[in-house]
């Protein structure tokens, strides 16, 4: 969809999907756009390097949530998670699997908290089901309300608040 600004015939407004805004800013076919910072962080590094974030806006807040299923009642903190991750490595001879649609944000967050013994599992959707199907031990996802996570009954025990929408 295309819009315009009255008395500004040289300006065209394109209504695009938030992910497409990032792609087009990166390839130079857009001059300015509004999109989620999470999408920028998940884009290719060469795209990230081409985009200048101008201003943080005060809407569209979302959290990157690390969530575990209820049976893991002994995991209450990130330190507990790191301990479990080492147990997986030492006793089960495998890494703790984390299902996510946001590998860059997840990796950066877990590393920043000292959790290093994990393997990312790419999710294309219904991430909250991965622990129940045996595909991962825990998940990370972006949420603003937490409704989907609550509906699927995992316990959310830590989160990282992502920056709100920005002009890029």
Predicted regions and their residues:
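Short helix-initiation/N-cap motifs at beta->coil->alpha
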Residues: 2-5, 9, 13-23, 120-131
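Short active-site oxyanion
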Residues: 10-12, 29, 93-97, 118
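Paired acidic/hydrophobic, glycine-rich loop segments that form the ligand-binding mouth/hinge
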Residues: 14, 31-36, 137-143
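Glycine/small-residue-rich loop that forms an oxyanion/phosphate-binding "nest" at active or ligand-binding sites
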Residues: 32, 39-57
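A conserved helix-loop-strand patch within extracytoplasmic ligand-binding domains
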Residues: 49-110
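BRCT (BRCA1 C-terminal) domain core and associated BRCT-interaction motifs
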Residues: 146-151, 155-157
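Conserved small/polar residues in nucleotide/adenosyl-binding loops
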Residues: 158-164
């Amino acid at each position: 969809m295309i819009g315009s600004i009255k008395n500004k015939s040289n300006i065209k407004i394109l209504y695009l999907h938030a992910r497409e805004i990032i792609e087009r800013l990166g390839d130079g076919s857009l001059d300015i756009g509004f999109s989620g910072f999470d999408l920028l962080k998940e884009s290719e590094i060469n795209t990230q390097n081409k985009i200048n974030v101008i201003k943080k806006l005060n809407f569209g807040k979302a959290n990157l949530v690390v969530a575990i299923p209820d049976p893991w009642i002994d995991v209450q903190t990130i330190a507990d998670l790191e301990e479990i991750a080492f147990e997986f490595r030492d006793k089960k001879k495998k890494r703790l699997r984390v299902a996510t649609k946001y590998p860059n944000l997840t990796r950066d967050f877990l590393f920043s908290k000292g959790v290093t013994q994990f393997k990312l599992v790419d999710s294309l959707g219904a991430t909250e089901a991965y622990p129940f199907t045996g595909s991962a031990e825990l998940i990370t996802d972006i949420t603003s309300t937490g409704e989907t996570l609550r509906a699927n009954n995992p316990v959310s025990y830590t989160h990282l608040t992502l920056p709100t929408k920005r002009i890029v």
